[in-house]
């Protein structure tokens, strides 16, 4: 099981998966001892570099106010863009939207430029996948989100806009946390030579994250399983 996920699981997540697969109830301390005895260790996340955002055009208050829970799907969405470097020095940018109810990635887009269209495409995909959603939509103060055209998109679905305070990345904590997970469990483990190679790996990882990566806070389920369980209740 450890090799199946390329060594990304620590003892707590390994405990969830062992118990789920074997229908047992092993204590996490026992799994920790077993993993330690055979030198199994999870990959460690790297720290994120933060940048100062200047001269926004349209801003909003921090309506979310670090209330990182939601009672139902599509109640609160978080978004952000992160950067990847290819082996030849070129860059790629991933935009994603995370639902706070189940921590699922409801939409994402990968591009060669960090521009408005990347963010617009991500938002449009989320709306198409979740018709009728009117979420609280939280982001940082990046220029794509302070764009008047993006504000019009939010108004078009009657979404409430919320923004992190300047320099306070913790205001978007779960989104930042997802970037850390994705990079430590996928990106930092290998080199990517082409944009297409990176895109394939990201597609595979987000599918894994949404459908097979069990989370204790989701009652031991993967994000989409927890989401679907709520939708049919």
Language-model segment annotations:
Residues 155-159, 181-233:
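C-terminal domain-tail junction helix/linker
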Residues 53-55, 139-141, 147-150, 163-183, ...:
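RNase H-like two-metal-ion nuclease catalytic core shared by retroviral integrases
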Residues 14, 31, 35, 64, ...:
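Mobile genetic element proteins and their domesticated derivatives, centered on retroelements
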Residues 1-72, 168, 222-230:
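Basic, flexible linker segments flanking DNA-binding modules
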Residues 102-108, 161-164, 188-189:
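Short small-residue beta-strand/loop micro-motif enriched in glycine and branched aliphatics
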Residues 90, 109-130:
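Active-site beta-loop-alpha junctions of metal-dependent nucleic acid enzymes
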Residues 66, 70-106, 112-113:
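An active-site-proximal beta-strand-loop segment
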Residues 7-11, 27, 60, 74, ...:
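Hydrophobic (often cysteine-bearing) scaffold residues that line and stabilize catalytic clefts
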């Amino acid at each position: 099981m450890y090799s199946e996920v390329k060594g990304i699981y620590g003892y707590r997540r390994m405990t969830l998966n062992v118990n789920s697969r074997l229908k047992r109830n092993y204590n996490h301390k026992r799994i920790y001892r077993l993993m330690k005895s055979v030198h199994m260790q999870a990959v460690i996340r790297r720290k994120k570099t933060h940048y100062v955002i200047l001269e926004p055009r349209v801003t909003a208050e921090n309506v979310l106010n670090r209330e990182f829970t939601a009672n139902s799907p599509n109640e609160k969405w978080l978004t952000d863009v992160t950067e990847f470097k290819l082996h030849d020095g070129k860059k790629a940018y991933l935009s994603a939207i995370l639902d706070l109810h189940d921590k699922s990635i409801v939409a994402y887009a990968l591009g060669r430029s960090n521009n408005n269209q990347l963010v617009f495409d991500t938002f449009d995909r989320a709306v198409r996948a979740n018709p009728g959603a009117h979420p609280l939509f939280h982001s940082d103060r990046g220029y794509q989100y302070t764009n008047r055209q993006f504000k019009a998109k939010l108004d078009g679905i009657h979404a409430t806009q919320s923004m992190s305070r300047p320099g306070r990345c913790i205001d978007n904590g779960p989104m930042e946390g997802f970037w850390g997970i994705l990079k430590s469990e996928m990106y930092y483990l290998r080199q990517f030579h082409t944009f297409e190679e990176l895109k394939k790996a990201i597609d595979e990882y987000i599918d894994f994250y949404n459908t097979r990566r069990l989370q204790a806070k989701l009652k031991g389920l993967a994000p989409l399983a927890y989401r679907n369980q709520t939708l049919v209740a």
